[in-house]
Regions:
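Catalytic cores of DNA base-excision repair glycosylases
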Residues: 13-28, 33-199
């Protein structure tokens, strides 16, 4: 039992409200309210409205360490210049970095190009749909692989970042170090066990 400030959790809902005691005896108690909260308040984002594997991959890389509002114009401009994996694989680095200019963390752009080259040579230009295959691409870690697999390919894969780890640690009164890779792997496994297959 822990006290969650600012959250009201019920059978079918999760709202921001007054502090209430929350009993999290098992993670499956929070899945349904979280999904209902998402359905009610989700943001309309271009990469979610047309969630092709390329669009989701590009957006997830751009969103690393960058605010959503800052990414939107770059995302649109990038897709106009490089609309698919092949054009990304073939672009000159100078043009790529010019398109990326202002987003920072330029290795993200370089890894996108490297990964696009690998997708073209090893997968015929089709971004692989399996989580394990996505992890083999440069610049794609477990969070990004989970996001691509779940959003673009409808797979039951969590996308666990620091926010998810912190929230679950608080809900479960778990004092393990969330920076420990073993803790993240454990949380990913726990979440796979409660994720609904119809979402």
């Amino acid at each position: 039992r822990i006290l969650a400030y600012g959250c009201l959790v019920g059978e079918d809902y999760l709202t921001i409200d007054e502090p209430v005691p929350v009993f999290v005896d098992s993670l499956d108690r929070i899945a349904k309210p979280l999904l209902a909260w998402y359905d009610a308040g989700r943001r309309i984002l271009p990469w979610r409205e047309e969630p092709t594997p390329f669009h989701v991959w590009l957006s997830e890389i751009m969103l690393q360490q960058t605010r959503v509002e800052a990414v939107k114009p770059y995302y649109d401009r990038f897709l106009q210049a490089l609309p698919d994996v092949r054009s990304l694989a073939e672009v000159e680095e100078e043009k790529l970095l010019k398109l990326w200019e202002g987003l920072g963390y330029y290795n993200r752009a370089r890894n996108l190009k490297k990964a696009a080259g690998k997708v073209v040579t090893e997968y015929g230009g089709d971004i692989p749909g399996r989580y394990e295959e996505l992890l083999k691409l440069p610049g794609i870690g477990s969070y990004t692989a989970g996001a691509i697999a779940s959003i673009a390919f409808d797979q039951v894969q969590p996308a666990v970042d620091g926010n998810v780890l912190r929230i679950l640690a608080r809900l479960r009164a778990d004092d393990r170090d969330i920076l420990d890779a073993k803790v993240k792997k454990s949380v990913e496994e726990d979440l796979r066990g409660i994720m609904p297959i119809d979402r």
